[in-house]
Each structure stands twice: as C-alpha cells, then as structure tokens.
C-alpha cells in the first residue's frame, strides 16, 4: 500500500504507533526538550515549547476549571495537560495506550487525585476503572489521529455515557487542510523513525462528533494555525470546545 494515501479511508497499524511512542518515552531523558516526545518536532525542540505554551494559554481559560470538576484525559501521553490542570480540579483520570508514556506521566505528575491507566481509548470507555463515574470535562488532544475509523466511531459513541449535562469536551487534532491524508508507516527524516497517522479533515471530525456523540453544542471551533509550519502545506491544527446538552 502507498505510504501517503489521499482521500481514502484506510487503517494504520496501531501496534506500530504504540511501539513508536513507547520508544520515544524511553528516550525522554536524552531530549533537549521533553515535550518533543509527544508534540514531535525533533529537529526544532523550541517548536514543541511554543506549541505547548500557545495551546495551554489559548485553551485553559476556556475550560472553566474548578475544584469540583472531574476530568478525563484520553490520550494523556506523558501528562502534558495533566500537569496544567490537575491542581485546579477535584480528580483527574488519564488514559494512554503507551505504557512507557504512562510511566513518565506518573513520574511527572504526583498529585494524589491523579490516576493514570494504560489502555486504548475504546477499551478505557468500557472499563469500570473509567466508567465508574461521570466526567465534567473530557480532553482528547492529538489522539484521534492515531485511531482507526470504526474504533473512533465506537469511542465517540461511548463518550455519551460518561458525561453529565453541560459537561465540556475539548478536541484538538492535526487535520488535512483540503482532504484526508493517511501516512501509512512512512519513514520520517525529522523523527528518524517510521510514522503513521490519519489526518482527517475538519469537516470529517465535525460529522463524526455530530453523529456519534450527539447532543453537543459547539461553543467554538476552528483552526489553530498560529504555529503551522510553512513546509507542512497539507495539514493544520483544529480544535473544538463543545458542551453536552443531552440527546
């Protein structure tokens, strides 16, 4: 199969993706900037710092965090967002499919009210460790691009069962500007590794959310192109902040 697939819905090998992030987590101590572990940009470490600062500064004030909120972070990685929100909320639950990333998160964020689990997102949304409570805020930042279509639909559908009326969702993803683009185990000179991801379009994400989560209202959504790189002409960053109103 071609390494770059345009327009078509094809699956990526999630086993390779897990291995990719496990290996990156193991090298975190050797990195000039640890956020490149999850935000990539290995050849420009300062980009990861700028992106992290920009996203947190842009999004966190919109999340209405307080000590009564319970947060679910799906695809939490090394705890980048946990570090920013955990001391402002009642409880935080982070899930990631990379055991090595979860190990780093547990080292980085040691609050007693933070809980980290190694699971795929679709498994987590059916696991009693996660389903035992409702959440006031669900974060899915930079993770849907690593989930194949059927599993993503099921994950979005299951999310409805875990939120309260008026709960918030924050989504952020790398997206195809013009059309869907799948990188199918492609060699990256910047990362010095094989890489796979699905860059759905903004419209595709909105359609999936509307159909499978259902009952949400958009507070705001759009492109986060402040730090888009000139050489990445086919992709951008998209975000959405939504509130669950019930079916």
Question: Which sequence ranges carry the predicted segments?
Answer:
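Class I (Rossmann-like) S-adenosyl-L-methionine-dependent methyltransferase catalytic domain
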Residues: 1-67, 74-129, 147-154, 158, ...
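A conserved beta-strand element that flanks and buttresses the S-adenosyl-L-methionine
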Residues: 139
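Hydrophobic adenine-recognition pocket in adenosine-nucleotide-binding enzymes
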Residues: 143
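Conserved helix-to-beta-strand junction in the class I
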Residues: 161-163
């Amino acid at each position: 199969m071609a390494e770059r697939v345009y327009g078509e819905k094809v699956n990526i090998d999630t086993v390779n993706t897990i291995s990719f992030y496990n290996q990156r987590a193991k090298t975190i101590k050797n990195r000039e900037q640890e956020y490149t572990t999850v935000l990539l940009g290995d050849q420009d470490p300062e980009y990861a710092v700028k992106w992290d600062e920009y996203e947190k500064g842009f999004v966190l004030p919109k999340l209405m965090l307080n000590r009564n909120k319970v947060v679910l972070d799906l695809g939490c990685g090394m705890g980048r967002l946990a570090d920013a929100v955990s001391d402002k909320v009642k409880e935080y639950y982070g899930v990631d499919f990379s055991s090595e990333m979860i190990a780093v998160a547990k080292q980085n964020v040691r609050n007693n009210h933070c809980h980290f689990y190694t699971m795929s997102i679709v498994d987590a949304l059916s696991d009693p460790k996660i389903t035992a409570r409702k959440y006031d805020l669900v974060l899915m930042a930079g993770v849907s691009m690593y989930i194949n279509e059927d599993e993503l639909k099921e994950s979005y559908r299951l999310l409805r069962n875990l939120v309260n009326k008026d709960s918030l969702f924050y989504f952020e993803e790398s997206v195809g500007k013009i059309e869907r683009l799948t990188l199918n185990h492609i060699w990256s000179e910047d990362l010095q590794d094989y890489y796979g991801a699905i860059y759905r379009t903004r419209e595709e994400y909105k359609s999936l959310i509307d159909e499978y989560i259902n009952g949400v209202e958009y507070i705001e959504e759009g492109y986060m192109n402040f730090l888009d790189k000139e050489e990445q002409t086919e992709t951008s960053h998209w975000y959405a902040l939504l509130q669950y109103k019930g079916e």
